Amino acid sequence: MQNSPLTADCSLNAGRPLTIGLVAGETSGDILGAGLIRALKVQVPNARFVGVAGPLMQAEGCEAWYEMEELAVMGVVEVLERLPRLLKIRKDLTQRFSELSPDVFVGIDAPDFNITLEGRLKQRGIRTIHYVSPSVWAWRQKRVFKIGKATDMVLAFLPFEKAFYDRFNVPCRFIGHTMADAMPLVPDQQAARAELGIAPNATCLALLPGSRHSEVEMLSADFLRTAVILRDKLPNLEVVVPLVNSKRREQFERIKAEIAPDLSVHLLDGKARVAMIASDAALLASGTAALECMLAKCPMVVGYRMKPFTFWLAERLVKTPYVSLPNLLAGEELVTELLQQECQPQKLAGALLPLLQGGSEIAALKERFLVLHQSIRCGADEQAAQAVLELADR
């Protein structure tokens, strides 16, 4: 009887333990890599993991040829400054993985670095997986052909990503989203409010103007003006503002002192998820925060503005009808998106007010959020591990 992938013997014909090559390039990839390693060790306790790893992956037993920070470079200038070093690392990894010949190589996110590496290893007969699809479904869609040549399998968080790859006959497995696994289906709003010092009967609005300097600079003033308008209509309104680090907090405080010095807000160091769960509605920049807000069952409005030329370019490059993940998942506009010239305080406040006032429509919206949550809550770590074992013929 042939072993199933999850009960396979843990040694190769040559007697070598299952060997998995991994490259993670940033903190989010380190989290995914650690979860994958944990899930694989449940099935194959003596498996070996080696490559580029952060502290979480190393704590799970991954041997690091290079530290993850070597690849964690942001910004055009920084990338150009580090390019010779990055190219040298990629050349060395190509050589070392070719000599090691792991059963499977898994490139975790970092597509600009990993997809080329995956392609070189695949040419040498090594099976390759790219974990976390780049946003090829949204823009630069021709990248799908390079990904198809470089990988034996793409692991996708979202079902519409798999549907996109299927159109191009690129093997892709929908595994669900790790964030959906981590968040409860029914969040405890009162516990979140107690943690933040928000009264149980207060009306609470979360402002999340983004994590990048440019986003906070571009959005904070209009978000604050929106909160002032809403505070005039809802005197008991509490406003919470989670900020990712001290730099963004200082930046936001500077803008608030100029725009809305008399507006009382709860500034939070991190705690975005708690703030979303505690709030009746959120005003946020697009991105992963919108998905997290949906999983927190918090109604939201997405407001986003960028420099005019950047927006002009994005309009021509982006191929999707929506920018926020809740709408992309639903295939319809569940969440109001006010972009560029539409991102004005009066319009933002007008969209948020009915969300803050509650009612039957809000209950129906939260039910839709719950259904979408369930649709992507699939045990992503275990699904990813099974994909690796199947590709390794285990």
Curated annotation (Swiss-Prot):
GO terms for molecular function: lipid-A-disaccharide synthase activity; phospholipid binding. Pathway: Glycolipid biosynthesis; lipid IV(A) biosynthesis; lipid IV(A) from (3R)-3-hydroxytetradecanoyl-[acyl-carrier-protein] and UDP-N-acetyl-alpha-D-glucosamine: step 5/6. CDD domains: Glycosyltransferase_GTB-type (cd01635). Signal peptide: none annotated. Its EC number is 2.4.1.182. Keywords: Glycosyltransferase, Lipid A biosynthesis, Lipid biosynthesis, Lipid metabolism, Transferase. GO terms for biological process: lipid A biosynthetic process. InterPro entries: Glyco_trans_19. It holds the Pfam family LpxB. GO terms for cellular component: membrane. NCBIfam families: lpxB (TIGR00215). This is Lipid-A-disaccharide synthase. It comes from Yersinia pestis. The lineage of its organism: Bacteria, Pseudomonadati, Pseudomonadota, Gammaproteobacteria, Enterobacterales.
